């Protein structure tokens, strides 16, 4: 077993925690990073420090926001209140924004429901979601959730929780591959899934 200096071993260890990064890729990235000059590494280190100290979630929709701001720019700006899109994580919000297929409001669940792993949706996020529906009075709630077993369980749970609201609940159309996360879906496929969404 190759014995690396402690600082390099720790760097490889933490890089491997990133999704999709195995040992060889982590090793390659680590050697790339140690080839950077000290100033570049300090800038990168500051970026990591800022994530730890400044990361903050919007109290309304729970996507990411600037720590100095009261809420996120999605909630501050003029958007279509007739549509509310429910997603699992903040990254889904930014992905949908890049695809330019949605102009309404967002709500981030934080996780998908999974009885097997014990994942659940926080009561606070669910409570605020219901409160926002009462306030915004949207005509449609779009479940933009991965086409996985966890996504299906979450969609069914939300349908049951929100069924007393007089609002149409829809889910993205088939075309999103079963078992695939939004991360791997191109904008064109997502646009078709949005335009072909169906009542759920």
Curated annotation (Swiss-Prot):
Toprim domain residues are 82-177
Q: Which InterPro entries match?
A: DNA_Rcmb_RecR, Rcmb_RecR, Rcmb_RecR_Znf, TOPRIM_dom, TOPRIM_RecR
Q: Which UniProt keywords apply?
A: DNA damage, DNA recombination, DNA repair, Metal-binding, Zinc, Zinc-finger
Enumerate the transmembrane spans. Answer: none
Is-annotated flag, keyword Calcium? no
Please name the SMART domains in this protein's record.
TOPRIM (SM00493)
What Gene3D superfamilies does its record include?
3.40.1360.10, 6.10.250.240, RecR Domain 1
List zinc finger spans: C4-type.
58-75
SUPFAM superfamilies annotated for this entry?
Answer: Recombination protein RecR
Molecular-function GO terms, alphabetical: DNA binding; zinc ion binding
Q: Which domain of life is it from?
A: Bacteria
State any GO BP term from the record. DNA recombination
Which stretch is the leader sequence?
Answer: none
* HAMAP family per record: RecR
Give the protein family: Belongs to the RecR family.
Q: What does this protein do?
A: May play a role in DNA repair. It seems to be involved in an RecBC-independent recombinational process of DNA repair. It may act with RecF and RecO.
What name does the UniProt record give this protein? Recombination protein RecR
Q: Which gene encodes it?
A: recR
